[in-house]
Structures are given as structure tokens and as C-alpha cells.
């Protein structure tokens, strides 16, 4: 379960199934991977039962993703403004002028100065931390109800990591959204998450609020 306004941390070693599980929420699993059974309930609807068009209305709109490596996630030959505005034009049905204004506001909201000038820059003109801020602005472009952050600070140095964590915490309140935060860093989740799920070999080993996980872990793997 994911509750409104909470940050749910999913933690586990590499290969434990963290990313695969959350990619299945919006059916982004690449072949030959596939969902065999089960259900994913969002707003009383099983996402797995939706056709492609209905799923697209949710993906990138009501449920959005921030991926681990912004350099490989951003298109190197497209200006960042065009990459942000794409979802806005598709889901919010704004005209080009208002969509551009919204895009510039998003760039500004994630802490990138001179947003109007940076709108026409390419990904290679940004630092790693700034590229991740661009990814965050893409994730927030349509005011999602749920933001899935898949190890969004892994490729960044410690100082920039802290800035990105603080930024996402602030934006969670501003946009009134829930967050699923995937990481292998238990220390990071200590001051960030409300609840934590511990995974190993594709299975949930333990689930509890953050205080219980740290003060009284039940499963040997968590300990």
C-alpha cells in the first residue's frame, strides 16, 4: 500500500527486485520480462487491466518516474525545454505559449537559475546535479499524484545528493504527492521515509514504519 502524502522507501541490495517491482506499476517492464499475475490497484482501478491508451493517461501524468541516470535518460540532441514540455502538451492540453510558461516555472521551481535562458540548453550543458533537477521537473510536469524516484541520487556526490533529497522533500509538500523512493542506502531513508519495505530476491522480507525498522528490525536480512 501507498498512502497519500507519504514517502515509502524500498531498500535492498542490487538485483533484489526493487526497480522491477516499481516499473511494473506503470507496465514499463522490458521484454522478455512480463507480469504473470496479480493486480495493481490505483484509484479503485486495476492498472494491469487497462488498455494502452488508458494506461498512457496515467503514466507520466498521474504516476511519474525519476530515473537513476539523468544523462542516459535525457535525449542528448533535444533542448531540455522541449523534453519537459512534451508531457505537458500531451496530458494537460495547454497551448504552446502556456505550456512554455509552465515549463519555465518548473525549471525555476527545481532550483535552476535563469530558467528562461536554460530552456534552450542541451543536456550536456548541465552538470550531473542540474541534469537530475531537469529529470525532476519532467517528473513533476503534470502534477502527479505519485512520484517514483528510482535511486535518483546514486550518480551524484554527497553534497549534491543532500540538495536533491531536500528539493524532493520540499516539492512533495508543494505538489501534495506521494513518493516511492528506491535505494540501497538505508542511512538515506532514515531521515526521509515514513515507511520502509526491505526486499531480497524479488520478495518483501519486512515492511514497517521507519522507527520500527531501525529500532526493532524483525527479519534477519534487515538486521
What is each PLM-predicted segment?
Residues 76-89:
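Q-loop/switch helix immediately C-terminal to the Walker
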Residues 13, 27, 148, 152, ...:
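P-loop NTP-binding/switch modules centered on Walker-like glycine-rich loops
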Residues 3, 35-46:
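Conserved ABC transporter NBD signature motif
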Residues 141-145:
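A short, proline-enriched helix->beta-strand linker immediately N-terminal to the Walker B motif
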Residues 121-126, 130:
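Conserved ABC ATPase signature
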Residues 46, 86, 97-117:
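Conserved ABC ATPase "signature" region
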Residues 47-64, 90, 212-217:
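ABC ATPase NBD coupling module
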